[in-house]
Amino acid sequence: MAADLAVNPGQCTLAYWHRPRWQDNGRTSGNSSYFVQALHNAGAEVILNGHEHLYERFAPQTPAGVAGADGIRQFTVGTGGKNRHGLSGTAPRNAQARSSSAFGVLALTLHPTSYDWRFVSEAGRTFTDSGSHPCH
């Protein structure tokens, strides 16, 4: 992966896989630490995960979980419709938005120098999350 990132140094890089690095309960997935480090070294912008049946958006952060402008933003979007997991009582460090109240999808738009996101809830639910962010 690091070699692929090195020969494709474009802005607004997005990566995705199943289990999130940072999770609602404050745990981290050690299995993804190599990927997150390689992506951070390459200046990637976004990680998109599922697995947890909830929605979370984290501030850009380093592989160590320290918020910073040069970090990677993680979205956990496991809200496809099977069931919903409850949220832990305390938001994990750097969590900016989270919900387990609605099924829905995340619309991501990658621009040449920025990206936009918008969580679209199922009919009848009011949770929403949207924004834009510049690329590194």
Question: Model-derived features: where do they sit?
Answer:
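Binuclear metal-dependent phosphoesterase catalytic core
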Residues: A64-H136
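His/acidic metal-ligating clusters that form di-metal
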Residues: M1-R73, C135
